Swiss-Prot record:
Originating species: Aeromonas salmonicida (strain A449)
SUPFAM superfamilies found in the cross-reference section: Ribosome recycling factor, RRF (SSF55194)
Protein name as catalogued: Ribosome-recycling factor
Family in the record: Belongs to the RRF family.
Main subcellular location: cytoplasm
Gene3D superfamilies: 3.30.1360.40, Ribosome-recycling factor
Length: 185
């Protein structure tokens, strides 16, 4: 029983941290990274289709993404989707591929992105703490039903607290790494 609660809490906390890392990877830094375009949807035969299903995106160098589109007739549609996205990117076409140069981030934009990253990290911390609260409530229910002793309850709560601390440290580490990446020029 106690192990099930701990394992469930651990799995849910891990998912929260993984979700944070995914969100952070979508936030643009000064470096070109293919995941930057993951959220872009392209109108393809009347349906919104993710760009990664229509093209191969690679980082050509530190400041340029190269997009090789599988269906050449889709170049204009992909270009339009990138232009209308809120990423502030301006692709150029050579008929075969699209090149997307990444403009350097301004100091103001870096600060804004840092605020966004901090808010994402705080959301992840809150999620981890809520999972801890749920696990502790489950333990209290077991204690109330006399399925576990008070000592077992206390021991399990301490272990869940250690889990919480370790996952919050992972969140803080991810935040520090992303802030450092954002502030690099």
């Amino acid at each position: 029983m106690i192990n099930e609660i701990k394992n469930d809490a651990k799995d849910r906390m891990a998912k929260s941290v993984e979700s944070l890392k995914t969100q952070m990877s979508k936030i643009r830094t000064g470096r070109a990274h293919p995941s930057l375009l993951d959220g872009i949807q392209v109108e393809y035969y009347g349906a919104a289709t993710p760009l990664k299903q229509l093209a191969n995106v690679v980082a050509e160098d530190a400041r340029t993404l190269s997009i090789s589109i599988f269906d050449r007739s889709m170049i204009q549609a992909v270009e339009k989707a990138i232009l209308t996205s809120d990423l502030g990117l301006n692709p150029s076409s050579n008929g075969q591929t699209l090149r997307v140069p990444l403009p350097p981030l301004t100091e103001e934009r870096r600060r804004d992105l840092t605020k966004i990253v901090r808010a994402e990290a705080e959301g992840a911390r809150v999620a981890v703490r809520n999972i801890r609260r749920d696990a502790n409530a489950d333990l209290k229910a077991l204690l109330k039903d006399k399925e576990i002793s008070e000592d077992d309850d206390r021991r399990a709560q301490e272990e869940i607290q250690k889990l919480t601390d370790s996952f919050i440290k992972l969140v803080d580490d991810a935040l520090a790494a992303k802030e450092k990446e954002l502030m690099e020029i």
